[in-house]
A protein has these predicted regions:
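Short beta-strand segments
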Residues: 7, 46, 84-88
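Active-site-proximal loop/turn and secondary-structure-junction residues that shape catalytic pockets
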Residues: 9-11, 49-51, 89-91, 114
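Histidine/lysine/aspartate-rich catalytic loop segments that bind and position anionic ligands
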Residues: 29-66
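C-terminal active-site subregion of NodB/CE4 polysaccharide deacetylases
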Residues: 40, 57-158
């Protein structure tokens, strides 16, 4: 089993965190680092848009560009086809899910929403984001109660 890292193709730092949370800038992986990880055989890479946009904040034309161009750039960078896509911030809408399918992805993951059962909906698989955090918060996020809380919290949003 491989770990999956989702690449944002047109940024070289975590702009979304710096701008929204006033966090310190964190450089994203260089091409050399990406290739080293790919060549290790332990890492799979996935698409994650050009600029880490929220699909709630852009129209369909911009969403399609973010998905399609990111896939094209990242596949060229890696020299292989991408199988998996991650919706930035977990934000998705029906039209975006269809775009991801049309781009040829095999499945897509969200954050906080979607099924925890892999075979239920291949384009709405839930994953839990584990950011830089404490051990207590890590344990909280992997507990079943946390997943139930998140499912209730976002039930009507998506």
């Amino acid at each position: 089993m491989k770990a999956v890292i989702f690449l944002v193709s047109e940024l070289d730092y975590d702009r979304w965190t710096v701008e929204s949370d006033n966090e310190k800038r964190f450089d994203l992986m260089s091409d050399e680092e990406v290739m080293e990880l790919q060549n290790s055989g332990h890492i799979e890479f996935g698409g994650h848009t050009l600029t880490h946009v929220s699909f709630f904040d852009v129209d369909d034309e911009r969403a399609r560009e973010e998905i399609e161009k990111d896939k094209e750039i990242t596949e060229k960078r890696l020299g292989k086809k991408l199988k998996v896509f991650a919706y930035p911030y977990g934000h998705k809408r029906k039209e975006v899910v269809e775009m991801v399918k049309e781009c040829g992805y095999s499945f897509a993951v969200s954050t906080d929403t979607g099924s925890g059962i892999f075979t239920k909906d291949l384009f709405d698989i839930r994953r839990t984001a584990i950011d830089k955090t404490s051990l207590i918060n890590f344990l909280r996020r992997i507990s079943p109660r946390y997943l139930q809380y998140k499912a209730r919290k976002y039930k009507d949003k998506f």
